[in-house]
Amino acid sequence: MQHLQEIIANATSAINAAESLVALDEVRVQYLGKKGELTVQLQSLGKLPPEERRTAGQEINVAKEAVQKALAERKDALQSAELEAKLAAETIDVTLPGRRIENGGLHPVTRTIERIESFFGELGFTVESGPEIEDDFHNFDALNIAADHPARTDHDTFFFNPKLMLRTHTSGVQIRTLEERQPPLRFIAPGRVYRNDYDQTHTPMFHQVEGMLVDENVNFAQLKGILHDFLCNFFEEDLEVRFRPSYFPFTEPSAEVDVKGKNGKWLEVLGCGMVHPNVLRSVGIDPEKYSGFAFGMGVERLTMLRYGVNDLRAFFENDLRFLKQFK
């Protein structure tokens, strides 16, 4: 019995001295393992006289239970200490400010489209849309574009078949709107268009806004006045604007519109003209009664000029360093 008390005392001392679960398990093995001191005591019961075995066995079991209890208590204490240390290491200071959600921003091309829509909306122009996959009638024929015009070739246009293509301009929306409604009409048609070209100033997909006004007694002076006011509003300065004679199949007369930059050079910004009588006839409108003007502008072109961007491709490369400048 005195020997068992010594084992219990040694075991208890070793258990209390264990500073980790690994060290505690080593103590368990030392006293309760297959070759542990208390296990050896149980195995030696067979050597005792029968009349002593029962009492000795009870004493050994009491000692074993005492060691097991001490092990369990120490294990609980070590696990609690380990958990507290882990929680302390992961403590969050709830008084610290939270992480701010990063604010998004409109793409510069979207900003430009909205700015254009806002200006013309104040003049009573509606916003119309149409399919990006267009047929040859709405993309070419109804716009007075000849069968041998270069725009009808694979070099310029993405064809699905001879009669179906990705639209090369939003002028098809103008034709569809004229088919569905009768004058007086004033509307703009913003959207994506596609052409087979890719370099510093061209991409296969880009955005256009085309506008049209059809009514009685519409003249070129009205067109000039609206576009002059639009450009001064868009660039937020009193610009010098000039109209140069040009040619488009769907307008007559036609003009290119330039603005004078700060360096004194003229910069082309859009095209315009009076709607060609053949275009009106193609949609059943009498050109003797009604006249109209049309204009078209490249959104990326205007955006580049407004924000001083030199490479058109930057708008489509999704570089956050570039896009964050426009928040």
Swiss-Prot record:
The enzyme's E.C. designation: 6.1.1.20
* Subunit composition and interactions: Tetramer of two alpha and two beta subunits.
Checking CDD domains in the record gives: PheRS_alpha_core (cd00496)
Q: Where does Mg(2+) bind?
A: E252
InterPro entries for this protein:
aa-tRNA-synth_II, aa-tRNA-synth_II/BPL/LPL, Phe-tRNA-synth_IIc_asu, Phe-tRNA_ligase_II_N, Phe_tRNA_ligase_alpha1_bac, Phenylalanyl-tRNA_Synthase, tRNA-bd_arm
Q: Which domain of life is it from?
A: Bacteria
Q: Name one GO molecular function term.
A: ATP binding
Give GO BP annotations, semicolon-separated: phenylalanyl-tRNA aminoacylation
Protein name, entry field: Phenylalanine--tRNA ligase alpha subunit
Entries under HAMAP family matching the protein:
Phe_tRNA_synth_alpha1 (MF_00281)
Class of enzymatic activity (EC top level): ligase
Family from the record: Belongs to the class-II aminoacyl-tRNA synthetase family. Phe-tRNA synthetase alpha subunit type 1 subfamily.
Question: Per UniProt, which keywords does this protein have?
Answer: Aminoacyl-tRNA synthetase, ATP-binding, Cytoplasm, Ligase, Magnesium, Metal-binding, Nucleotide-binding, Protein biosynthesis
The UniProt note on the cofactor reads as follows: Binds 2 magnesium ions per tetramer.
The cofactors it requires, by name, are:
Mg(2+)
Q: Which Gene3D superfamilies does the record associate with it?
A: Bira Bifunctional Protein, Domain 2
